[in-house]
């Protein structure tokens, strides 16, 4: 590169103040100079000056610099290149490039000019290492090969490290191309280091596609990474591509063939054929086709699974043919597990191991094992068997003489990989002897034998530890360890002592080394019977007197095997008194009882057992026992399988204690078994196979002093208490109206099955077949329960019962073992006569008292009751006030018919005077003009009868005041004439002033004889308001009845009230009194007549 520079400096005279006046002139001169210089440079270039200097390096030693020649330069032009400040700094070249040694860091000035060409300018350049590019030479591939069985490409090239001045890091980039279109399938980098000399590098790559399937090409380039070089660093050019050469086989079309791959891998299969492939499948699965060059196709399988032992088929189908291969998918060998090496006989080492995870590969692809020993350098190969025992393999390695330490390495290998496991052992500490054989037993004496056996192996250099197992019947096994020196002939002998005479023993043997690694397996059992000896003890003896007290029965127990020391043949029983001994005949072995007829003297009884060797020591017992007056019977309960008896320590007991027991329900003599306990004991557990739950047993504790036994305690008890099996039998002794007396009997001991704790008595009301006491323990309130814990009580009186009532009674006994069954009955209490009498008298007395009180009250209030509920009702037949004159009903046009109106009940009050006014029965209706006797108003109010009456609903009518003034001796006053439409009653003042409001039903009214105009007008005014009018126009009446009354003055116009005429039928409502008709006697009885007073009838 050429740099053109121009340096301008101010002259000193331009600095002072005088120079400022020259500034403008100097600037013009400077610009003129620059312009001339630039024109000269342009003219020079046009004439052929070199330009664009560039330098590169391939090895950091030499820089290759080049420039562009001018267009005017011709052939044969020679350039001179000079570098300042360097010796031999000028170089000549006929080309436009030259190589110069690498320059030091910094700027360097380089000039280039053409020689022999006058007038040409010189080109100057500034060159720095930063402007130099480091571009390595293009690498060269020395060799490219392929392993088609594994689809692996092997690349080899030279790094040319000798051209570099020092150690550098070189980065290689390798590309793999596939198929005819040069598709890049892999681009990787590979780092190496050059150190000043040429080195050949190797690199391998495994293709995911078989190399036979398509063309594979490889190219390489490099990049030098020198940290000290400050210039630009660039990649070299790619090397020429090299291809993998493969010659097609006419037989094989599918690749890879018989491939073994790892489970879970991805694999590609291809079919190389000129035919068109229609489909492809692996196993039973169809796969999509991948098209390659020509008609070649491929399929890719992802995450392939384990194949069968025979492999998995891969098939390509064309129109005419089927091509295929087999693939085997499995695992690499697992690390051998549980590797163990030991010896049985110190002659041969056996190593065993577990292969671990199955590889799923069989046949030639199966795992092979090799056992290598590093100290000796020997190895053995595993010979495969079809079915290894217990999934464990083993190899045998012959021991080397005088070698005890072995270092084994077990190698495992199959087509998918390899693994190994190592073990270091001292073989003398890893001895696992074989099973001892040929066991023999010989007698030494009755308590010792000699054992011999055979143990294969050469154990002369070590000691053996053997264990002897000794078993005998009904005894805990015994293990004895013995240490013996190993021998070469494998025969061993050991004495076993401390045995029991006449005892069957079973012997077994196993062995190991003294350092112990493993016991051998147990040998076969060897049974042996030791010889007999004299019995070591006399029989266990007891005596009982017969029930009549005349004979003494001697009992003894058979000697146990460890005391009999042989087969007992017979027993000898003798008795002595005052040093006189009487011996009985020998008693054969099966019999263990003898009966002696003795008096009440204290004899010493001796019993001796005999076997084939001799007699046992005698067992002695006194015939009489020491009496004990202070003896109480106690109770005890066992623990399920036995019963615990305790007592206080007694130093006077010199020999031992004897506990005997029997079933309490059996007859005398009571003896089931006995047990002797040392004299220093204070308790004993009595156990027997004959004990049964719920059975009462008697236990007797005897203490021995001065060769005599004394009964110390008498105990009855149960091994386990149960509930009674029967209910107590009870009866009713007496019944009354309020109580029941029951009585029951004891339950037999055999059926009680425990200690009786009490009775539960239940009772409730209930009839037979209807009352069932359920859930007696549930606490029902209607069931009464009595718990009887006094066992001496045999009767119970149930009080506070109801008479003539049925009761359900239930009785149950209970023990600590549970509740027994129930016994029930129904009882009816007697009738309570006193209660019945009281029940009758109380209601009668109450009724009498209520009647008397009611009578007194009614008598005192009789008038009020009569007036209130039953007032006197006048007899219409005896009423003369209603008899009118005939003229009243004849031809009087003023009379009018009555009108029917709704009727509501009303009350009619009839006032009677006691003296002045005649009785209503004898009074006749008189004319209004007749003179009426005076009557007192007080008398009118004193005595009146209220009669129920039902008039029609009427309009009220004010009575004529004149009528009141002309009142006669008798009058009828109508009160409380109520209408359903009538307003509430008004005060008397309002009624007197209101003529309409006081009108009601008034059949009789007193009117004046001569009617005035005012009266008529008032009457007309009251027509609408007046109520019931029994008299209308008299002249219009049609008298049908011959007995109808008529007015004597038919011409006089009067208004009649209380008409006897019917409204509709115009019949007289109240017929006149007929003298001829029979009188009503009023003899008919009614409840109302009971309260009425009729003195005049």
From Swiss-Prot:
Biased composition (Polar residues): 1032-1067, 1086-1097
PROSITE patterns for the chain: FN3, HEMATOPO_REC_L_F2
SUPFAM superfamilies found in the cross-reference section: Fibronectin type III (SSF49265)
Gene Ontology CC annotations of this record: plasma membrane
Motif (WSXWS motif): 519-523
Disulphide-bridged cysteine pairs: 55-65, 82-90, 213-270, 341-351, 466-511
Membrane topology annotation: Single-pass type I membrane protein
Motif Box 1 motif: positions: 869-877
Phosphoserine modifications at: 927, 1044
Residue ranges, annotated region (Disordered): 982-1005, 1022-1097
Extracellular side: 45-833
Glycosylation sites: 85, 131, 143, 191, 243, 303, 366, 390, 407, 426, 445, 471, 481, 489, 572, 652, 663, 680, 729, 787
Subcellular location: Cell membrane
The protein's role, per its UniProt record: Signal-transducing molecule. May have a common pathway with IL6ST. The soluble form inhibits the biological activity of LIF by blocking its binding to receptors on target cells.
Domain-related comment: The WSXWS motif appears to be necessary for proper protein folding and thereby efficient intracellular transport and cell-surface receptor binding.
Name of the protein this chain belongs to: Leukemia inhibitory factor receptor
């Amino acid at each position: 590169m050429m740099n053109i520079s121009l340096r301008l400096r101010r002259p000193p005279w331009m600095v002072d103040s005088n120079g400022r006046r020259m500034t403008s002139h100097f600037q013009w001169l400077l610009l003129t100079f620059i312009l001339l210089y630039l024109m000269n440079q342009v003219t020079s270039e046009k004439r052929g000056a070199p330009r664009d200097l560039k330098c590169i390096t391939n090895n950091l030693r030499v820089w290759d610099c080049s420039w562009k020649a001018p267009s005017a330069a011709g052939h044969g032009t020679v350039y001179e290149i000079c570098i300042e400040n360097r010796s031999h700094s000028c170089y000549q070249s006929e080309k436009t490039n030259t190589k110069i040694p690498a320059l030091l860091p910094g700027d360097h000035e380089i000039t280039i000019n053409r020689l022999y060409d006058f007038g040409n300018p010189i080109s100057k350049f500034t060159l720095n290492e930063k402007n130099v590019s480091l571009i390595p030479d293009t690498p060269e591939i020395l060799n490219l090969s392929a392993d088609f069985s594994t689809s692996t490409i092997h690349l080899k090239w030279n790094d040319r490290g000798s051209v570099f001045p020092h150690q550098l890091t070189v980065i290689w980039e390798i590309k793999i191309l596939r198929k005819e279109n040069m598709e890049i399938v892999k681009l990787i980098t590979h780092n190496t280091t050059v150190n000043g000399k040429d080195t050949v590098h190797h690199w391998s790559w495994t293709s995911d596609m078989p190399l036979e399937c398509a063309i594979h090409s490889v190219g390489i380039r490099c990049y030098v990474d020198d940290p000290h070089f400050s210039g630009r660093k660039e990649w070299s050019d790619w090397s020429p591509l090299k291809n993998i050469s493969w010659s097609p086989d006419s037989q094989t079309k599918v690749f890879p063939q018989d491939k073994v791959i790892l489970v879970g891998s991805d694999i590609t299969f291809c079919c190389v054929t000129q035919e068109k492939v229609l489909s492809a499948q692996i196993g039973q699965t169809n796969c999509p086709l991948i098209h390659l060059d020509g008609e070649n196709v491929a399929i890719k399988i992802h995450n392939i699974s384990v194949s069968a032992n025979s492999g998995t088929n891969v098939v390509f189908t064309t129109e005419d043919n089927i091509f295929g291969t087999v693939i085997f998918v499995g695992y690499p060998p697992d690390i051998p597990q549980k590797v163990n090496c030991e010896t049985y006989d110190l002659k041969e080492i056996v190593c065993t191991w577990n292969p671990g995870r199955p590889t799923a590969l069989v046949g030639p692809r199966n795992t092979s094992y090799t056992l290598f020993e590093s100290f000796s350098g020997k190895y053995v190969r595993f010979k495969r068997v079809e079915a290894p025992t217990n999934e464990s393999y083993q190899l045998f390695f012959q021991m080397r003489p005088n070698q005890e330490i072995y270092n084994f390495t077990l190698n495992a290998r199959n087509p998918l990989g390899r693994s190994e496991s190592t073990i270091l052992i001292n073989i003398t500490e890893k001895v696992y002897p074989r099973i001892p054989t040929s066991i023999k037993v010989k007698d030494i004496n009755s308590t010792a034998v000699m054992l011999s056996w055979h143990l294969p192996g050469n154990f002369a250099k070590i000691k053996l530890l053997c264990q002897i197992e000794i078993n005998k019947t009904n005894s805990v096994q015994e293990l004895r360890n013995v240490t013996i020196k190993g021998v070469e002939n494998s025969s061993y002998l050991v004495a076993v002592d401390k045995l029991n005479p006449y005892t069957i023993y079973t012997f077994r043997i196993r062995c190991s080394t003294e350092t112990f690694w493993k016991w051998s397996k147990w040998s076969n059992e060897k049974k042996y019977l030791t010889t007999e000896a004299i019995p070591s003890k006399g029989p266990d003896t007891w005596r009982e007197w017969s029930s009549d007290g005349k004979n003494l029965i001697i009992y003894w127990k058979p000697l146990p095997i460890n005391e009999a020391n042989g087969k007992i043949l017979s027993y000898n029983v003798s008795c002595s008194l005052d040093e006189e001994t009487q011996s009985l005949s020998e008693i054969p072995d099966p019999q263990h009882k003898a009966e002696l007829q003795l008096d009440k003297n204290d004899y010493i009884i001796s019993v001796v057992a005999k076997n084939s060797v001799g007699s046992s020591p005698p067992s002695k017992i006194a015939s009489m026992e020491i009496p004990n007056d202070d003896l109480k019977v106690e109770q005890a309960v066992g623990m399920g399988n036995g019963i615990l008896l305790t007592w206080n320590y007694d130093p006077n007991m010199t020999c031992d204690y004897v506990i005997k027991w029997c079933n309490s329900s059996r007859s005398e003599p009571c003896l089931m078994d006995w047990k002797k306990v040392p004299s220093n004991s204070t308790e004993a557990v009595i156990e027997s196979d004959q004990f049964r739950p719920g059975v009462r047993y008697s236990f007797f504790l005897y203490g021995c002093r001065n060769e005599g036994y004394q009964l110390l305690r008498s105990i009855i008890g149960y091994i386990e208490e149960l509930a009674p099996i029967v209910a107590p039998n009870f009866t009713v002794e007496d019944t009354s109206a309020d109580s029941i007396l029951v009585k029951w009997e004891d339950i037999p001991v055999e059926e009680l099955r425990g200690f009786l704790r009490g009775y539960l008595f239940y009772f409730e009301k209930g009839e037979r077949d209807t009352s069932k006491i359920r859930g007696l323990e549930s606490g029902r309130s209607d069931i009464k329960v009595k718990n009887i814990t006094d066992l001496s009580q045999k009767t119970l009186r149930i009080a506070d019962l109801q008479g003539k009532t049925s009761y359900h009674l239930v009785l149950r006994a209970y023990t600590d073992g549970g509740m027994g069954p129930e016994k029930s009955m129904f009882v009816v209490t007697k009738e309570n006569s006193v209660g019945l009498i009281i029940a009758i008298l109380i209601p009668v007395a109450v009724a009498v008292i209520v009647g008397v009180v009611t009578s007194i009250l009614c008598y005192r209030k009789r008038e009020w009751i009569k007036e209130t509920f039953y007032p006197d009702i006048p007899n219409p037949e005896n009423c003369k006030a209603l008899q009118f004159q005939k003229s009243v009903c004849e031809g009087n046009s003023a009379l009018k018919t009555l009108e029917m109106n709704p009727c509501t009940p009303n009350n009619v009050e009839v006032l009677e005077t006691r003296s002045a006014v005649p009785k209503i029965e004898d009074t006749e209706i008189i004319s209004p003009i007749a003179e009426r006797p005076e009557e007192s108003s007080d008398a009118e109010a004193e005595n009146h009868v209220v009669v129920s009456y039902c008039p029609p609903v009427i309009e009220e009518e004010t009575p004529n005041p004149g009528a009141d003034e002309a009142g006669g001796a008798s009058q009828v006053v109508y009160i409380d004439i109520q209408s359903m439409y009538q307003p509430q009653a008004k005060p008397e003042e309002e009624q007197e002033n209101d003529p309409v409001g006081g009108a009601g039903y008034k059949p009789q009214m007193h009117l004046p004889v001569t009617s005035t105009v005012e009266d008529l007008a008032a009457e007309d005014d009251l027509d609408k308001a007046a109520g019931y009018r029994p008299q209308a126009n008299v002249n219009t009446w049609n008298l049908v009845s011959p007995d109808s009354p008529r007015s004597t003055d038919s011409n006089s116009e009067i208004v009649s009230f209380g008409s006897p005429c019917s409204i509709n039928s115009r019949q007289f409502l109240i017929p006149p009194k007929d003298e001829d008709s029979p009188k009503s006697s009023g003899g008919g009885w009614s409840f109302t007549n009971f309260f009425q007073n009729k003195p005049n009838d």
